[in-house]
A protein has these predicted regions:
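ATP-dependent phospho-/nucleotidyl transfer catalytic cores
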Residues: 3, 10-13, 29, 36-40, ...
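A short, low-complexity linker immediately N-terminal to eukaryotic Hanks-type protein kinase catalytic domains
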Residues: 21-31
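Conserved ATP-binding subdomain of kinase catalytic cores across diverse folds
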Residues: 34-38, 42-188, 258-261, 272-273, ...
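Conserved active-site aspartate in kinases
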Residues: 252
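Active-site activation/catalytic loop segments of kinase-like enzymes and analogous catalytic loops
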Residues: 262-306, 322-341
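All-alpha amphipathic helical-bundle segments outside canonical DNA-binding/catalytic cores
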Residues: 308-320
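Long, compositionally biased intrinsically disordered regions
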Residues: 364-367
């Protein structure tokens, strides 16, 4: 990459000190003209790299991977490479555009899909998908519906993928019974002396301990299939075409691993169909939006196009409830352990987050019959 005109000094900080070295190892077209931080992600360091080749401009996403969170980066990259290659083949066969409809890894000059710099940091690069935007909040029902279609379509395209080839990048990430076990230990150890002050929140979790293993038991017994799952199905992990308003591509594949589609569905509902912010202190503002819930079910099942089993569809409301309960349990566990995992911005922040999740669970329980009725409707 001779003739560089980019000043990397502004972004070459901390663990990203070797960004110029890393950028020079990938097979980009043209000469770099700009490199700046990009997006709202908190885990990896993400940059937009722009290049010029004659009159043509090209854009790439360059990422330094967080190997504290993802401790098997090689396995993670094998997952992403395998899944995106498979998706590309399916998309081409169905007449789609693989450069817009799935992530495309850019190889290094050594023919790999990642680079380890001289300080030991792991880097990767993707083609940048133009004329597409991500949304951090559900601004319109249609956008939530489009994201649901995208995640459902992702499930359908990968329904024959050999799941056994996937590495579990974060072991037991959505294993609710194990999360419950961790929570119980945190209560028992009470490392920070906080348990007495949250006895009602602890009781809320304990009252639902019989439900914790409902989906995992079905998965372990073969009652529902083990599938390729995304495991971070937030709205902002779907790109929406800025002209047509339709979903284009599912992104952020770091947590792609074996799991259940029921939990992928449920985590989207937890995040997107809540009428309040995740850390809302006024719990009267927290509720499940049934119109958003229905829009998401409709989009998800349309995207799946019949690839889910009847047992999976019946469990979708449980996915929503258990993902919300699990998330609240994780926030409360972290609060009891001294706020070591989730970043906090005020005293009691994790407790506020836990209370919000539990309030959402309570509202789901009030609306349970309607949640089940909507899941049973025929959308396709």
């Amino acid at each position: 990459m001779g003739g560089m005109t980019v000043d990397y000094e502004k972004v070459a900080t901390g663990a990203c000190e070797k960004i110029e070295e890393a950028a020079g190892q990938f097979c980009v077209k043209g000469v770099p003209t700009e490199c700046r931080r990009y997006g709202s992600g908190h885990i990896n360091d993400t940059f937009l790299l722009c290049t010029k080749e004659g009159e043509q401009s090209h854009s790439y996403i360059l990422q330094r991977m967080n190997t504290h969170v993802f401790q098997d980066p090689k396995g993670l990259m094998q997952n992403i490479s395998g899944v995106t290659t498979y998706l590309r083949d399916r998309i081409i066969r169905e007449g789609g555009d693989p450069q817009r409809e799935t992530l495309t890894l850019v190889e290094t000059k050594a023919g790999k899909d990642y680079y380890v710099d001289s300080l030991g940091s792991w880097w990767r690069m993707y083609l940048f998908i133009t004329d597409a935007v991500g949304y951090d909040t559900v601004e319109q029902e249609e956008i939530f519906y489009q994201s649901a279609k995208a995640f459902g379509h992702f499930q359908r395209l990968l329904d024959q993928y050999p799941v056994s080839q996937l590495t579990e990048t974060i072991p037991d990430f959505h294993n609710t019974p194990k999360r419950f076990g961790t929570f119980c230990r945190a209560v028992e150890e009470d490392a920070c002396g906080r348990a007495q002050g949250v006895s009602s929140e602890i009781a809320f979790v304990m009252d639902r301990k019989e439900e914790m293993s409902l989906v995992m038991d079905q998965l372990e017994s073969g009652g529902i299939p083990r599938r390729v799952t995304h495991n971070d199905t937030k709205l902002n992990n779907v790109l929406i075409d800025s002209r047509s308003g339709e979903a284009v591509c599912v992104i952020d594949l770091d947590t792609v691993m074996p799991g259940t589609a029921v939990f992928d569905f449920g985590d989207s509902i937890r995040f997107g169909a809540n009428t309040a912010e995740e850390d809302e202190r006024d719990l009267s503002r927290v509720s499940l939006s049934l119109p958003l819930y229905e829009a998401y079910i409709k989009g998800f099942l349309e995207g799946c196009a019949g690839s889910l089993t009847d047992a999976e569809v019946r469990l979708l409301p449980w996915g929503a409830k258990l993902m919300t309960l699990e998330c609240g349990m994780r926030f409360l566990t972290d609060y009891l352990e001294g706020d070591k995992y989730f970043r906090v911005h005020r005293p009691g922040h994790n407790l506020d987050r836990a209370r919000t999740q539990f309030a959402l669970v309570s509202d789901m329980e009030r609306k349970w019959n309607e949640m089940e009725r909507l899941a049973a409707k025929k959308y396709i």
